[in-house]
Each structure stands twice: as C-alpha cells, then as structure tokens.
C-alpha cells in the first residue's frame, strides 16, 4: 500500500533568494608609520630588559617571578597582538614611557661627565723593542750554563792555537781501551756464557 507522506518527509522549498550580499571586506589594520613601529620596538625591548633583569635578580617572590616569566613570554611572542603586548607592558611596569625618559636623562648626564683628554706623548714616536734586548732582564727561563765572567766583545780576539795530532794518541800504546768506570781485575775474567744458546 501507499505510504503516507508526513510533514517530515516533504521536501522543504529552497529559501527565497534576495539580493546577493557582497562579502564585507575584512578590516585591514591601519597602516602604521615606520617611526611608530621603531618607537614600539624600542619600548618593547626596554620592557623585556627590565623584566628580565628583575627576574634574574632572584629577589622576586615565587608568584611574582612566575607572572614576570609569563609576561616576558607574551612580550617576546611573535603571535601575540600588539594591543596585548601594550597591556602587558602597562600592567607590569606602569608608566613605562616616563621611566624610559628618566633612565635616558640619567644616561645623558652620565655621558656628559665623561671627558677625553689627549695624551702628551702623542707626538713621541713609538719604538720597537726586540726580544733579544728583553732576554737580559733575567726574567726568562734559562738553563744553568756557565756564563762568561768577562764581556768577550771588548777583548781582542785570541789567536787560534796550532793543532797537535799527537795529543789524540793514547798515552800508552799497549794499554787496552777502557771506559771510565772501574772493574775489579780479578772479576774481569769471570764471565759465564753457560746460559747463552749460540745456535746458528
């Protein structure tokens, strides 16, 4: 049999289309002057520096230190909106612009107190000191070689002595060569080769 159509199963008519609405343009952020951007960056860096200095001092209570760390995170975030950063700066530091002006005045006064005076030795030529001249000071490490007692540069050169080849000849032609250590004559012939194996 036939199924009865209920209100639910009846297709709804399509909605009446009126005039086609144009999409509303997204509000573009107002163009910000380059000077204002630079000023904001300076203020932002100053505030981050002040908060970081306070945090690094270690004198803050735990709750205040946590809030300061959160504020630094917001200020250094690249995704946080500009308005949020300004709010955090105002809440954390109060009138930060006035504080910046005071600090700038202090630094300006300090920079005025610095004086540069020319040195009197500026006309004097510089000189180079060789290392060999410094070695005579005695501060450098030296071996314990005997040093000549007299200055050899002031003495006349001594004549070269004639070479006498007979001075190289041993005094006794029949004596065997000996080292400079003593061996008892009775033990010199007591060498035992019993432990040596001379197989070829």
From Swiss-Prot:
Residues 1-28, 139-174 are annotated as: Disordered. It comes from the Eukaryota. Pfam families: DUF4615. Belongs to the UPF0488 family. PANTHER family: UPF0488 PROTEIN C8ORF33. This is UPF0488 protein CG14286. It comes from Drosophila melanogaster.
């Amino acid at each position: 049999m036939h199924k009865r159509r209920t209100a639910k199963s009846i297709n709804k008519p399509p909605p009446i289309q009126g005039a086609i609405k144009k999409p509303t343009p997204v509000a573009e952020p107002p163009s910000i002057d380059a000077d204002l951007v630079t000023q904001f960056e300076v203020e932002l860096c100053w505030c981050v520096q002040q908060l970081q200095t306070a945090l690094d001092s270690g004198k803050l209570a735990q709750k205040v230190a946590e809030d300061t760390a959160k504020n630094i995170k917001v200020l250094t975030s690249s995704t946080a909106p500009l308005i949020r950063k300004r709010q955090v700066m105002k809440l954390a530091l109060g009138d930060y612009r006035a504080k910046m002006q005071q600090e700038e005045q202090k630094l300006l006064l300090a920079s005025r107190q610095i004086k540069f005076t020319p040195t009197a030795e500026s006309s004097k030529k510089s000189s180079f000191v060789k290392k060999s001249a410094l070695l005579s000071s005695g501060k450098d490490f030296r071996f314990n070689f005997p040093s000549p007692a007299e200055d050899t540069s002031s003495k006349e050169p001594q004549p070269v002595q004639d070479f006498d080849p007979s001075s190289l000849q041993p005094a006794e032609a029949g004596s065997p060569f000996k080292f400079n250590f003593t061996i008892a004559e009775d033990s010199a012939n007591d060498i035992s080769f019993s432990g040596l194996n001379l197989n070829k």
